[in-house]
């Protein structure tokens, strides 16, 4: 007979650090995005540089919810073609998987996407002029902290997150 381990997975969520507890790094550049206040704040050597308004984010609780957590800038592209919507995303800054910070997107024929609900396919959208300024300022490897209490809400508790095995917790029975 093969015995199955008697450990129960314990749920944890993506790491979101609230503004109350966030401290920017004292050296180098950092980006802090608060998806509740819809603000993106930049820091350099621990000091505030500028604040931008976030125009759209992934809808909380949906498949496209923008994930909270601690990341780094992985890639910068002046113009990136989205694999989700086949639209151009100007001044794209990739921070995790298929998630980017970028300017207002436009179709391949050059027409901008209409302003709508304030939700995106998961990316963090800025005004294109703001995205350009951020793109020119940020470096590959810059810390990116994304905060959202939505990913921690009770409505969402069973749809997002990861499991961590806790060997001290036994399955009864």
Task: State the predicted function of each range.
Residues 7, 65-68, 77-173:
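Exported/periplasmic cell-wall-interacting domains
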Residues 7-111:
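Gly/Pro-biased beta-strand-loop elements
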């Amino acid at each position: 007979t093969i015995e199955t381990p008697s450990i129960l997975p314990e749920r944890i969520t993506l790491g979101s650090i609230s503004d109350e507890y966030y401290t920017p790094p004292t050296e180098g550049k950092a980006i802090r995005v608060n998806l509740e206040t819809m603000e993106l704040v930049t820091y350099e050597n621990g000091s505030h540089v500028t604040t931008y308004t976030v125009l759209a984010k992934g809808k909380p609780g949906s498949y496209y919810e923008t994930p909270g957590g601690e990341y780094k800038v992985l890639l910068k592209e002046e113009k990136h073609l989205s694999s989700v919507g086949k639209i151009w995303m100007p001044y794209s800054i990739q921070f995790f998987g298929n998630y980017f910070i970028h300017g207002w997107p436009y179709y391949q024929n050059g027409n901008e996407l209409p302003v709508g609900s304030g939700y995106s396919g998961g990316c963090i959208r800025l005004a294109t002029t703001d995205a350009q300024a951020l793109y020119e300022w940020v470096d590959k490897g810059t810390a990116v902290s994304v905060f959202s209490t939505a990913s921690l809400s009770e409505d969402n508790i069973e749809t997002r997150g990861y499991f961590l095995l806790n060997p001290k917790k036994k399955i009864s029975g």
